[in-house]
A protein has these predicted regions:
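Short beta-strand segments
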Residues: 70-72, 95-98, 132-136, 197, ...
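Internal gly/pro-rich beta-alpha loop/helix module
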Residues: 96-168
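Charged helix-capping and loop-helix junction motifs
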Residues: 51, 110-113, 231-237
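Accessory alpha-helical/coil subdomains and C-terminal extensions
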Residues: 15-25, 141-225
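ATP/NTP phosphate-donor binding region
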Residues: 1-59, 234
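Short Gly/Thr/Asp-enriched flexible loops that form oxyanion-binding sites at enzyme active sites
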Residues: 70-92, 228-237
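A glycine- and small-aliphatic-rich helix-loop capping segment at beta-alpha/alpha-beta transitions
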Residues: 2-14, 76, 82-95, 110-116, ...
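Short acidic, glycine-rich surface-loop motifs adjacent to enzyme active sites
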Residues: 62-77, 213-226
Length: 238
């Protein structure tokens, strides 16, 4: 991704800027590069995420692959990582990484995060830990990680859990792991599910509008331990 200095718009360049650095890694790892999508991360949908899952599992079966690194825009990085964590059947190291600064910005972190991700993906200890997210020297589980700031390079955090490992100059260090990890086999993503966030004073206006839409389900991020403002209840009861 590159930032237009006049407008501030960030958009994909003609090609992935990381590709020109691939030869520098040949002495350590043998990289197979596949440019699956070339689009901003807000354009990602579950359909593209499912395509990624299919490609990963197929490549692992067909080729002698020991690890996978996915470069991804940070806006929906956690969503893609979590989707893959739930659906990829392969147990080899799978790492999702990105950059908080565009490739033409001062202090761009994309290359460093990419190299860190390659180190983790080529580490045998990273296997069977589910999908991992690697940025800013930290290794997070896709199950717990979330983006906490719009621009800070330390934006990806795992609240209450913290990172499960670190990338250091000496190598990759894991200090704990998930106790439980499970995956699901899916062949298509076709259901239309609406997500709503509850707020103080919320009424049933949005819920009433959804009643007339072709949706298959509603997920409500409620208050407290599942509480909702009383004025939302009439539509829910219907």
């Amino acid at each position: 991704m590159e930032e237009d200095k006049e407008t501030g718009v960030v958009q994909p360049g003609e090609k992935n800027p990381l590709l020109k650095f691939i030869p520098d890694l040949e002495g350590d790892v043998d990289l197979i590069v596949e440019d699956v999508f070339h689009l901003p991360s807000p354009h990602m949908t579950p359909s593209e995420m499912l395509q990624l899952q299919v490609i990963i599992d197929e490549r692992v079966k067909q080729d002698n692959i020991h690890g996978v690194v996915i470069t991804h825009g940070t806006d929906t990085l956690e969503e893609t990582a979590y989707f893959l964590d739930l659906t990829v059947q392969a147990t080899i190291p799978i790492v999702v990484t990105g950059a908080m600064r565009s490739s033409n910005e001062l202090g761009a972190d994309g290359l460093y995060n990419f190299l860190s991700a390659v180190k983790v993906a080529s580490c045998d200890e990273a296997a069977e830990k589910g999908v991992l997210v690697v940025l800013n020297d930290e290794i997070h589980c896709a199950t717990n990680v979330t983006k906490t700031h719009t621009s800070n390079v330390a934006t990806f955090q795992s609240p209450q859990y913290g990172p499960i490992g670190m990338v250091t100059k000496r190598g990759v260090v894991f200090h704990h792991a998930l106790v439980h990890h499970e995956t699901y086999t899916i062949n298509k993503v076709s259901k239309n599910v609406v997500v709503l966030k509850a707020y103080a004073g919320m009424d049933d206006t949005l819920l009433a509008a959804i009643e007339n839409l072709p949706v298959d389900g509603i997920v409500i991020e409620a208050l407290g331990q599942g509480n909702l403002p009383p004025r939302t209840l009439p539509s829910l009861e219907r």
